[in-house]
Amino acid sequence: MYKCALVLAAGQGKRIKSDLPKVLHKVCGKEMVNHVIDTIRKAGIQDANIIIGKGAELVKERTEEKNVTYSLQSEQLGTGHAVQCASEFLKGKKGTVAVFAGDTPLIKESTIKNLFNTHIENKNAATILTAIVDDPTGYGRIIRSGNEVLKIVEHKDCNEEELKVNEMNSAIYCFDIELLYESLSKLSNNNEQGEYYLTDVIEILKSEGHNIGAVITDFEETIGVNSRAQLAQAEEILKDRINLKHMENGVTLIDPKTTYIGIDVEIGKDTIIYPNNIFEGNTIIGERCTIYQNSRIKDSIIKNEVDIQSSVILDSSIGNNTTVGPFAYIRPESKIGEKARIGDFVEIKKSIIGDGTKVSHLTYIGDAEVGKECNFGCGTVVVNYDGKKKYKTIIGDHSFIGCNTNLVSPVQVGDNTYIAAGSTITSEVQEGDLAVARAKQRNIKGWVDKKGLKK
């Protein structure tokens, strides 16, 4: 059977008080609407249409890689009106369509599958995802007669008896596409808000004798984000889920409460994560690594048995058995080899560092290719920028760079070379050479007395 989805993402979200469309606020490093789309796809629904409105172009930009289509809701006149705006997407289709809110990032793949299966197996015209809550204030109520679903009443339109109902509408549904399409033209805005409610479709279908079903799920999954406080709540819930998944897969988190792992991050077994670490984007961390406190790693590949302490690694790769930090900064497009050492207060920018090379402290390497088994003394600087353009430096294998050396790019240093401490290198150093580029020391006798500086 054909399955598709509509994602309602047209609202600005006044309560969140932001210039950014509400659905583009991130939870665990990913936009809420993209959480919804990714979960839909995992549940086996490939055809999705996003209903956009406020900030439409920005929403399209942030979701363009998801292979979705779009419908425009120019005026926000309610959820029913939003689905009406997707009529062209629905027209002529047969099967089942699910409707999701773009601000519900906690919905699970298994719940979506269960909703579809229940809907199809029971041949329902509509199936509502619901939850039981102690305080349903603000939510639409599921009105039943026994176990039979009769209708959904929005909170502001509830009478005294309906307000006592604690089964709430999650705003996630499955519909028979043809029946939904026919019902959209029958919606009315005769209510307190003057809006077209998608929930009224339930009552329309029921009045026509169609079967309406409901699937009850955990309230946590249905939380819609309408404020910064709810955004933080969703972040905390999803963070706990992610951390639990990694611990179940063999990763040790010393303090899960202070460990922030993005939803797309992968971590190998027997890796140990200390407190106050942040892993973001498409980061992959291998097995048997130790990530000590206060590190941030984003969009990077960390191979096996790597030790990292109090460092920042962005869009780079670190080879097996390498150590990084403390207080190292690996900037984008850097590649660090195996068994290397990147020490304290070292900055690597857009450079390749060969296997076994040691850059132990207080060094800047930018736009460089460094061979294997090299050693950098303290205070080395690759001078790669002349104020207009950045230039490349190449350093061969087994080279020794003395302390306080400046390598003025573009420059090439051959294999097995030595550079004396304090040198400023401006031209090629050939293989096997020692380069000394510093002024000869000159001692001026009696200078302190002559200047009257003796104490």
UniProtKB/Swiss-Prot annotation:
It is an enzyme of class 2 (transferase). Residues 1-228 are annotated as: Pyrophosphorylase. InterPro entries: Bifunctional_GlmU (IPR005882), GlmU-like (IPR050065), GlmU_C_LbH (IPR038009), Hexapep (IPR001451), Hexapep_transf_CS (IPR018357), NTP_transferase_dom (IPR005835), Nucleotide-diphossugar_trans (IPR029044), Trimer_LpxA-like_sf (IPR011004). GO terms for biological process: cell morphogenesis; cell wall organization; lipid A biosynthetic process; peptidoglycan biosynthetic process; regulation of cell shape; UDP-N-acetylglucosamine biosynthetic process. Residues 229-249 are annotated as: Linker. One of its GO terms (cellular component) is cytoplasm. Its cofactor is Mg(2+). PROSITE patterns: HEXAPEP_TRANSFERASES. Its EC number is 2.7.7.23, 2.3.1.157. Binds 1 Mg(2+) ion per subunit. Mg(2+) binds at residues 103, 226. PANTHER family: BIFUNCTIONAL PROTEIN GLMU, NUCLEOTIDYL TRANSFERASE. In the N-terminal section; belongs to the N-acetylglucosamine-1-phosphate uridyltransferase family. In the C-terminal section; belongs to the transferase hexapeptide repeat family. This is Bifunctional protein GlmU. It comes from Clostridium botulinum (strain Alaska E43 / Type E3). The lineage of its organism: Bacteria, Bacillati, Bacillota, Clostridia, Eubacteriales. The gene is glmU.
